[in-house]
From Swiss-Prot:
Changing residue 54 to A: Abolishes interaction with PtdIns(4,5)P2 and cell membrane localization. This is APC membrane recruitment protein 1. Keywords: Acetylation, Cell membrane, Cytoplasm, Lipid-binding, Membrane, Nucleus, Phosphoprotein, Wnt signaling pathway. It is found in: Cytoplasm; Cell membrane; Nucleus. Residues 455-466, 1119-1135 have a biased composition (Polar residues). One of its GO terms (molecular function) is beta-catenin destruction complex binding. It comes from Homo sapiens. Residues 23-35, 94-107, 196-208, 253-262, 282-291 have a biased composition (Basic and acidic residues). Changing residue 181 to A: Abolishes interaction with PtdIns(4,5)P2 and cell membrane localization.
Length: 1135
């Protein structure tokens, strides 16, 4: 269809061009002059009518005083920024616009050549007639860039200089003002009574154009049109590409008269949406074009048409001459040129609408100036033409206004596109290519500012005369209007018109403040940024009522109200959406706060749990520590108990033995009646006369009796001698006694030769027996110095080798009651008892050869006096005469024998002599500070000579023990310990007695009355069948005598004294009941008793180490060698 239209247009154009050539022939010279006047705007290919058009335009413009001057001079009123720039001074008269555009259109097309690439039909809603007219009026590229607003921008990159060929043709014919005048006359002649529009409707398909112009235009238009039809297919709406001006006119007529659907109108509406745009865009020219086309087509055959033209343009040869003819022409032209220059200098931005109006109104204000510019002979003709034109223009302007309103509606609908909202006007038009789109995100428009796209109203206003149409469009322009303010900044010309037009709608869509400057959506009711979502599309979709409306129909009030309501609803929904978003945000914030709180609580719970766990762990550790400590304490306690048990074990063992190891001890007689228990005692501690002894006290003797030592009370220091664990430990006992004593006691060596020993040990004859024995049992180094001994300053260990070879002792257990009084003497009341106690001695304790060396020196012819030897320690080999049968048969220890029994055994007189001598020696040894006490009491004072004894440990625990050879000499039987202080020639043995270490505690022993021999005394039940191996006797510590000094009060009690022989104080290192002292004689001759009986028991006081005898006994001179057992034997003492 487009092709048919193109062909028809070409044919009609050829016809028109032919008629135009005829007309042009008449005006050759005038056209040449007009061409010269046109300058660059006219092309040589353009025909005469174009030149006539320009000349006529100028002439008419000069004559018109009603703002109908073509905007060529001043561009009319500048459109502001809406039409691209003030370069196009636009006048309201579409006729003049059409004339100017018609004059320039073909020439511009020719100048562009094939460069014009956009067919008019394919430029939807982008060609306002005023724009194209003004664009055509401008020179050079101004005409090329005069394409309507957004369309020119949309296609500006590809086709920067595109004239509007369609409107150019229309404008060409419309610009021939003389044709209109001739048109009426020609119409009257050919078709009388038919008016321009009617003629156009009658001949809608006749495409009128001047012959020379049509070929050029058609050629230049068709080729680019075909080229550009494809690019514009997708983005832009397609309208029938027929470039002829007739189809728009036909469209307009058809749209106005829908009862006469013409092919052109149908073709114009092939594309529903672009067709209204195209028609509306071209409608402004269609009345003019129609009439002018009719005039062009109808009048060319008639010659009179050329005559008015020749008459019209006869005197006008150039613009220069026009200026010279017009008195104010220079001023007017200057004003117009100034506005054009300003618009050109503004970079394509035209001046504001006020400037446009001002340019056209200046002419109106000057008034009458046009007459001065016209020749006098043409005044009447021009006036007639003006009247005709005015009448025609009035009709055209009214039609144009209506069309402009519709066009404006369509354009404004495109000017505010939304991505998802398709206005019913152009459903196929993509949003990016709307002609009046304000914010096109895709395309840039270098030639025009965005504000230039917003002035459809200014186009319509300027396309019609200001004064004659009843518009109250503008005021008299002031100087401030020359500032060329932008469209959006000044809207003073947007006042309502007296006639209803589309401006009211324009004011509705475009408030006073610029859409360009104001953010979209603030002043515009539509969402220009496409912020509406799909949910709002139903509310913002105007297609239902817009598409149902014909393209040329006006928007009704109801539709506007619906639009407003939809927009309000949209904003309401938008508000609700925002509120929902805020609610969601608050909810999310609350959830986040709750999550944070929960996390905080969880963290706090974890921390609390960790602290609690740590506390539990700490408690557990503390409990484990306490438990471990408790276990450790229990272990220590267990160890202590085990240690104590081990310490007590030997005690128990010794208690279980009938006779334990020989331990020295003194038993204090604490009871008036001597009761000797049969239990075994392993150790005896001394008891004081004033307090009952604590036999289980194992504290060290030094600490228990610390600070209590004194000269008079030194016997209790014997306790210190026995505080040695070695006495209770079998290991130590074995170490001490399990072999050679030399190994256990390195300081002890047995005497090899008694005679040699006498010589070497002279001056150290005696050693305290208790010291030697304790040293013997306590590893030989317990008492290197006796701090409690006031008289002994040397260690007794040095004198240990001088111990008597034979020392015997026994223990008598006594009960604890009766402290301080000696118990009743255990006596042999009959010979049978005595014989039973000594029957085992028949076997002999030592072999005979052990005493052969001493036989010649020791009491020749007399038996060895053993007054206190144990039952099994008989010495049958000492003397050819065996001991008396009574003593042999008595099972009691000889230390318990009474004087009567001992008296029977002692028969030699020299023993008495020795006894007396020793008595004298002892008397001399009394301590000076104790002499008064001896005189008052008549007691012998001395360190108790507890003679060393030799008990065969092999019978119990001591495996190897050598028999001790007893020294025999002519000296006395014993030597007082005082002889230690000085060398004594009277003491050939120098070891007869051992001094008891000084003690801090005195034991008072009451010697009970002696019993008659016939009385039955306590029988000592001790095994006598045990054999004691013989061996050398070892002196434990030879240096003992050096550290010990014998007390001068020490005395030797005679064995025959019944009270003393049976009463003695027993000392033992372990808790024991009190034991009676055991008298031990070392080869002491037992003298016959001077007094067989002692009438009363005398109290016996043990001094530091002595037994105090009664004066009566001292007078008798009977002395008895008393032996203190340092360790209590497990002797079962029979009472």
């Amino acid at each position: 269809m487009e092709t048919q239209k193109d062909e028809a247009a070409q044919a009609k154009g050829a016809a028109a061009s032919g008629s135009t050539r005829e007309q042009t022939a008449e005006k050759g010279a005038k056209n040449k002059a007009a061409e010269a006047t046109e300058g660059p705007t006219s092309e040589p290919s353009s025909s005469g009518p174009g030149r006539l058009k320009k000349t006529a335009m100028k002439l008419f413009g000069g004559k018109k005083g009603i703002c109908t001057l073509p905007s060529f001079f001043g561009g009319g009123r500048s459109k502001g920024s809406g039409k691209g720039s003030s370069k196009k001074g636009l006048s309201k008269s579409k006729t003049h616009d059409g004339l100017s555009e018609a004059a320039h259109g073909p020439e511009d097309v020719v100048s562009e050549g094939t460069g014009f690439s956009l067919p008019l039909p394919e430029l939807p809603c982008q060609f306002p007639s005023s724009q194209s007219a003004h664009g055509a009026l401008e020179t050079g590229s101004r005409c090329k860039t005069s394409v309507a607003g957004a369309t020119e921008k949309a296609v500006a990159e590809k086709f920067p200089s595109m004239p509007k060929p369609k409107k150019g043709l229309k404008g060409f014919f419309s610009s021939i003002r003389r044709h209109r005048k001739s048109k009426v006359t020609g119409a009257e002649q050919s078709e009388p009574g038919a008016k321009g529009p009617e003629r156009v409707r009658a001949r809608p398909h006749e495409h009128v154009s001047s012959a020379p112009q049509v070929p050029c235009f058609e050629e230049t238009f068709q080729a680019p049109r075909k080229e550009n039809a494809n690019p514009q297919d997708a983005p832009g709406p397609k309208v029938s590409p027929t470039p002829e001006p007739s189809p728009p006119a036909t469209e307009k007529m058809a749209c106005k008269d829908p009862e006469k659907p013409m092919e052109a109108c149908a073709s114009a509406h092939v594309q529903p949406k672009p067709a209204p745009e195209a028609s509306s865009l071209e409608e402004p020219h269609s009345p003019e074009t129609g009439e002018k086309v009719v005039a062009g087509e109808v009048n060319p055959p008639n010659g009179p048409v050329g005559d008015p033209l020749s008459l019209l343009f006869g005197d006008v040869t150039s613009l220069k001459s026009f200026d010279s003819l017009t008195g104010c022409g220079d001023i007017i032209a200057e004003q117009d040129m100034d506005s054009m220059t300003d618009s050109m200098a503004s970079g394509g931005q035209r001046a504001n609408r006020d400037g446009t109006k001002r340019s056209s109104c200046l002419v109106t204000y000057q008034g009458g100036g046009e007459e001065m510019a016209l020749p006098d002979d043409d005044d009447e003709e021009e006036e007639e033409e003006e009247e005709v034109e005015l009448e025609e223009e009035e009709e055209e302007v009214k039609e144009e206004e209506e069309d402009d309103d519709l066009e404006y509606l369509w354009e404004t609908a495109q000017m505010y596109p939304r991505p998802n909202m398709n206005l019913g006007y152009h459903p196929t038009t993509s949003p990016g290519h709307h002609g009046y789109m304000l914010l096109d995100p895709v395309r840039s428009y270098p030639g025009l500012a965005p504000g230039e796209l917003l002035t459809p109203q200014s186009d319509q206003q300027e396309s019609a005369p200001n004064s004659d149409e009843g518009y109250y469009d503008s005021t008299t322009p002031g100087f401030e209007d020359d500032s060329g303010e932008a469209l959006g900044l000044v809207r003073r010309d947007c006042l309502p018109r007296d006639s209803y037009s589309g401006d009211a709608l324009y004011e509705f869509y475009e408030p006073d403040d610029s859409l360009e400057n104001s953010p979209p959506g603030d002043d515009c009711l539509y969402d220009l940024h496409g912020r509406s979502s799909e949910m709002f599309d139903p509310f913002l979709n105007f297609e239902p009522f817009l598409s149902s409306r014909p393209p040329g129909a006006m928007e009704t009030e109801e539709e506007r109200l619906v639009t407003i309501q939809k927009q309000l609803l949209y904003w309401e929904l938008r508000r609700e959406q925002l509120e929902a978003q805020e609610a969601r945000a608050r909810e999310a914030h609350a959830r986040e706060a709750h999550a944070r709180e929960a996390y905080t609580r969880e963290a706090y719970g974890r921390e609390a749990y960790a602290r609690e766990a740590h506390t539990w762990e700490a408690h557990g550790r503390e409990a484990r520590t306490r438990e471990a400590q408790a276990r450790e304490v229990r272990c220590r306690e267990t160890q202590v108990r085990e240690t104590q048990a081990r310490q007590e074990k030997p005690v128990l063992e010794y208690q279980m033995r009938p006779l334990g190891p020989s331990v020295m001890g003194l038993a204090a007689g604490v009871s008036g009646t001597s009761q000797i228990s049969h239990r075994g005692i392993t150790s005896a501690f001394p008891t004081t006369a004033s307090s009952e002894p604590d036999w289980r006290d194992f504290r060290p003797l030094e600490k228990r009796y610390e600070g209590t030592c004194s000269k008079k009370d030194q016997s209790t220091c014997l306790m210190q001698l026995f505080q040695s664990d070695a006495m209770f430990e079998p290991d130590m006992q074995e170490a001490n006694f399990g072999g050679s004593p030399r190994r256990a006691y390195p300081t002890y060596s047995p005497p090899e030769d008694p005679e040699e020993e006498e010589v070497e040990k002279e001056g150290n004859a005696t050693v305290s027996f208790s010291q030697a024995l304790v040293e013997f049992t306590s590893n030989g180094n317990l008492f290197s110095s006796m701090s409690c001994s006031s008289d002994s300053d040397s260690s007794f260990t040095q004198n240990l080798p001088e111990l008597p070879p034979m020392v015997t002792f026994d223990i008598a257990d006594v009960e604890r009651d009766g402290e301080g009084k000696c118990e009743e003497n255990p006596e042999f009341h009959n010979d049978e008892d005595l014989a039973a106690s000594l029957e085992a001695f028949e076997l002999g304790y030592y072999h005979k050869h052990a005493f052969n060396n001493y036989h010649s020196r020791f009491y020749q012819g007399l038996p060895w006096g053993v007054s206190s030897l144990p039952r099994y320690l008989g010495l049958p080999g000492l003397h050819p005469r065996p001991p008396p049968a009574a003593m042999a048969l008595n099972r009691r220890s000889r230390s318990l024998d009474t004087a009567e029994t001992l008296e029977m055994e002692l028969s030699n007189s020299h023993l008495v002599q020795g006894y007396l001598e020793s008595d004298e020696l002892q008397a001399q040894q009394e301590d000076s500070d104790e002499e008064d006490e001896e005189e008052e009491e008549g007691e012998w004072s001395r360190d108790s000579p507890l003679s060393l004894y030799t008990e065969p440990p092999g019978a119990y625990d001591w495996p190897a023990w050598a028999p001790c050879p007893l020294p025999v000499g002519p000296g006395p039987a014993w030597i007082s310990p005082n002889q230690l202080d000085r060398p004594s020639s009277q003491s050939p043995y120098r070891q007869a007695t051992c001094c008891i270490p000084p003690m801090t505690m005195s034991i008072s022993l009451s010697v009970p009355e002696s019993r008659a021999p016939g009385e039955s005394g306590p029988q000592l039940a001790r095994p006598s069948h045990l054999h004691l191996p013989m061996g050398p006797c070892y002196n434990l510590q030879p240096q003992a005598s050096q550290s010990m000094r014998a007390r001068p009060r020490d005395v030797l009690l005679p064995v025959d004294e019944p009270s003393c022989s049976s009463s003695s104080g027993g000392f033992s290192p372990s808790p024991l009941p009190q034991a009676k002292p055991v008298g031990i004689t070392h080869g002491i001759p037992q003298l016959p008793r001077v007094r067989p009986e002692h009438p009363q028991p005398q109290p016996t006081h043990y001094g530091p180490s002595s037994l105090d005898l009664s004066k009566e006994r001292a007078e008798q001179g009977a002395s008895l060698a008393t032996s203190y057992s340092s360790t209590a034997m497990n002797g079962n003492l029979a009472k």
